[in-house]
């Protein structure tokens, strides 16, 4: 059995500022996730915040991605150490932490993924991530192979973006466009000039601090604009969105 899980190639690609094109997985189903894994995306977000996912639904999705080139990234429902620990133990190495507004919150997110003395991650000697105790040097290698992406989606987060981006252990800054738009008074309108200006500012400050930036942009024109603005890791759609629009288009083509 191949029990080599390191190094984390997605983390290395981000550190090298290589463009990484991703997709959102929101259907909470191993078959749809497996299909996404066959498409050739660099990374996939398995959403634990707005999709009906938990440990029991995420494990089969991780299994479905075994052998895929797509790096699984879990968006946890909240920045909470026990939740993060459980995601680590089932086999996630890449984390998207929602609603980070301060440097302290970013520090706490990093600490939750690191074993002592660098952090506070609880220790289990046998779990899915270390292939039930068979991965050589897991405890030595784990801390330096975890990816932490923090999500900026409020005015306070925008105000503190430099301090957040400069936090040791933070690998990238991700913009939550819908929540950011709502926070800026433009609910449902991420295209508003004020929101777009804030997004561009976040990208610029991430770059100034040597960190890659990312965003979810299911509209192709938006995704290409964000890439031109310097975003490195961009999710260009979702399984739910593709399924909904594709089936609607198919039905409409025959019913009109």
Swiss-Prot record:
Cite the active-site annotation: 50 (proton acceptor)
Q: Does the keyword Manganese apply?
A: no
| Keyword annotations from UniProtKB, A to Z | Lyase, Magnesium, Metal-binding
Q: Which cysteines are joined by disulfide bonds?
A: none
Reaction catalysis annotation: 5-dehydro-4-deoxy-D-glucarate = 2-hydroxy-3-oxopropanoate + pyruvate; 2-dehydro-3-deoxy-D-glucarate = 2-hydroxy-3-oxopropanoate + pyruvate
Q: Which Pfam families match?
A: HpcH_HpaI
Site (Transition state stabilizer) found at 75
- Positions bound to Mg(2+): 153, 179
Protein's UniProt name? 5-keto-4-deoxy-D-glucarate aldolase
Q: Which organism is it from?
A: Escherichia fergusonii (strain ATCC 35469 / DSM 13698 / CCUG 18766 / IAM 14443 / JCM 21226 / LMG 7866 / NBRC 102419 / NCTC 12128 / CDC 0568-73)
Name the gene for this chain.
Answer: garL
